[in-house]
A protein has these predicted regions:
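Terminal output helix/cap of sensory domains in signal transduction proteins
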Residues: 64-86
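PAS/LOV-family sensory domains
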Residues: 11-15, 42, 136-140
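PAS-family sensory domains
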Residues: 24-25, 88-94, 107
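Short loop/turn elements at sensory-signaling interfaces that couple input to output
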Residues: 101-118
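PAS and PAS-like sensory/regulatory domains
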Residues: 17, 83-85, 92, 97-101, ...
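Short hydrophobic secondary-structure edge segments in sensory/regulatory modules of signaling proteins
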Residues: 17-23, 142
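PAS-associated C-terminal cap
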Residues: 1-7, 120-134
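PAS and related sensory helical modules
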Residues: 28, 32, 39-59, 66-71, ...
Length: 142
C-alpha cells in the first residue's frame, strides 16, 4: 500500500473531517457549501455556520493564524493549484481545534475556479506533539 493510499484510508477512519467548497471574491475566500461532516466538526448546523461566518472562511479561523494561512493558501494556489496547511479554528462552543487542510482548484461548469478542501480535526495529534516537545525540552542535556 502506498503512503498516499494509507493516508486516504486513514482519513476515512477519522470521524472529525469534512469538505468545503469556496471561491475567491475581492481577495476574500467565500464559502459556497460545506458538508455535514464539516458542520459536525465545528458544532454548527449548515445554516448556523453560514450565518456565523457571514459566508467567509476567514471568520472561522482563529484570528492570530488568519493572515499567515491566508498568505500561504494564496501563494500555493497560485504556484501549484493546491495547498496543505495546519491552523486553528474556533468551534461554536468557543473551543479551538487544530485542523489540517488540503485544497485544490477545480473549475465548475461556468469556468469559475472553485477551491475544494478537505479539513480534518488534528487536535489530538497536535496535543500529543506539543506534549512530546515539552517532555523533550525538559530532559536535562536535551
Amino acid at each position: 500500500m502506498t503512503k498516499e493510499m494509507w493516508q486516504l484510508a486513514r482519513m476515512h477512519e477519522l470521524k472529525d473531517f469534512g469538505e468545503r467548497l469556496s471561491h475567491y471574491e475581492n481577495d476574500e475566500m467565500l464559502i459556497d457549501e460545506v458538508d455535514e461532516g464539516f458542520c459536525n466538526m465545528m458544532g454548527y448546523t449548515q445554516s448556523e455556520l453560514m450565518i456565523r461566518s457571514c459566508g467567509k472562511v476567514g471568520d472561522l479561523v482563529y484570528p492570530p493564524d488568519y493572515e499567515e494561512i491566508r498568505y500561504q493558501i494564496r501563494k500555493n494556489l497560485k504556484q501549484s493549484g493546491s495547498y496543505t496547511c495546519r491552523y486553528r479554528m474556533r468551534k461554536k462552543d468557543g473551543s479551538l481545534i487544530w485542523v489540517w487542510e488540503n485544497g485544490r482548484y477545480e473549475k465548475d461548469d461556468t469556468g469559475r475556479k472553485n477551491i475544494r478542501s478537505l479539513v480534518v480535526d488534528v487536535s489530538r495529534e497536535e496535543k500529543t506533539m506539543r506534549e512530546r516537545d515539552t517532555t523533550y525540552d525538559n530532559i536535562p542535556g536535551g
